[in-house]
Structure formats: structure tokens, C-alpha cells
């Protein structure tokens, strides 16, 4: 049983000596990009449309910045002569306390890019770092796993430096960040740590993230701010 009866899932239709792209091709490519992203069904629901930005002025400011970044990213991608070349697009960092909505916004950016056919790989910091460390003695596995995040067209790092930070944690994330820094590959980053704290944890990583993000550093402040509590009201 084929998903597409027209091309029999070949994505192309043969017309004499010519192969014509089937109308299902773009849909299949988009599905593949989404599957490879590592973003769960739950997180796919985190969009700009479902974000409650009316809660607080800080939330609204962060929302506006994230929306504008997404629009600029898509525009730059659409205007690029080579659709695979997105290395001139800067990164974005969203930092703030627990429950400030930074994960929702970073996911909304990622989901917007995915909907436009732009590949994004999701990296939940603590989970992935733990998996990598558990297999650190397997050189082939280590290189392959780290390479996935180094070479992703767009990388979303969620909750950077969450949990107790060890020297090996810093070394692993430096490998990823430094590769992307040297190759101008954009990142979407969320963290509970503010910019100064990121620099204190590791200046080499923090300084690279700041340089890569340029004007796209969003700090969500406010002691009473908790997006998770108020979004349902």
C-alpha cells in the first residue's frame, strides 16, 4: 500500500525520458525533517499561536524578539541562492528563571523553521550530555553522536547547563559550540543562567555564544514572573 498512488512513494513521476517531482515530494521531505529533529509530539504543540504573551511586559518583549528572529531567519533562508547555506544567520539565546516561557519560545522558533522546511535538531542538554558521557569510552559512538549536534543545520539546545555541571560536561558542550562557532552554524539556546553566569561557568563557551547571537540575546527577568502558572488563566 503506497502513501502516494501517483508516484508509488518514489517522489518522482517518469514522463517519457524525464523525471518530474511529484506533488507529494515536499510533504515527504518535511515529514523526514520533522522526524529527524528529535522534537516530541508534545513539544510540536509549542507554537507562537499557543504562547500567552499578554501575561507580562517581559514575556511580550521576549515573544516579539523570538517572532522577529523567526521571520528574519526564514526571510534570509528564502533569499539565499543556496538553500543549504544558512551560515550567515546569527543565533539566539533566551535566558531566564524557571517557568519564564523560554523553552516554549525556543520551541516555537524551531517549529516555525521546521514548518518552512528548515532542518532543526533538538538537544535537551542534560539528557544528551548524560547519554554521551555514558558512552564516552566508545570512540566511534562518541564521534558519531557529537557530530550529530556539531553539524546540524540549526541546533536547539534546551536548558543549557541544567543540573550539576562537571568538567566533562563543559568539555563536551565546548566541542559542539566551538565547531558551530568556527563554521557559523546557527543555534537556538535556552538557559536558566543569565549571560554573566554563562561566562562564569566557562568563558570560552559563553563568549562564543554571545558573539554568535549578536543582538539576539533575550533576558527574561522578574521575581514574580512564572509563565507556567499564569498561562492557563
Task: Tell me the role of every PLM-derived stretch.
Residues 1-61, 65-68, 216-217, 222, ...:
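A short, basic N-terminal segment
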Residues 65-85:
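Pre-Walker A adenine-sensing motif
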Residues 118-119, 151-154, 183-189:
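Loop/turn-to-beta-strand initiation segments
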Residues 54-64, 95, 114-151:
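Short glycine-rich substrate-engagement loop in P-loop NTPases that contacts/grips substrate
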Residues 126, 145-168:
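Conserved P-loop NTPase "ATPase switch" module shared by AAA+ and STAND
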Residues 82-106:
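Walker A/P-loop nucleotide-binding motif
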Residues 104-118:
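P-loop NTPase Walker A phosphate-binding motif
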